[in-house]
Amino acid sequence: MIEFLPNAPDDAWLWFACDSNYDGNGQLIKWMIEQPTCPEAAALAIYWYSGAGFYAQYQTREQVPDHSRDQFDVLQSLQQRFLGGFYRKTAVGFDPRNDPTPIGILERPGYDWVAGEPHAESLPAGVKNALAGTQFGVMNMPEGWVEGMPLEINAVVEQEYEDEE
């Protein structure tokens, strides 16, 4: 994916951000948010999918349980970059109050990340506001894509998992 994404369309970045297995793809997610070429919409989606609403309950790093501090740090850095204009503006949008990705429930697209967590309202307005642009949910992914990856890339990943076992 690191070879694929730099030349991929902007919506591919967002599809991966919204459909990826964050437990298994943490290194790639981290790589994505370190790239100034990452579309704003993908960065904002990663912010919310990474638990920004949950971590909003903590005012300082010291309040965060030890085992979660690294994730808190990642979210703080991502928030600072996003609000500072680090990411690339594109025609792809993302609305954290109306995410067209159904979060595993095809019958309920339109998830509200801000209302979904009681502490999310305390986050800065800039990360709660919709980014203008086409709202590409996972339902718009090309047929055959798995976890936000083209079939041929997913096949390589699956083979690597099998080889490790």
Please annotate each region the language model reported:
Residues 1-165:
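Alpha-helical scaffold segments
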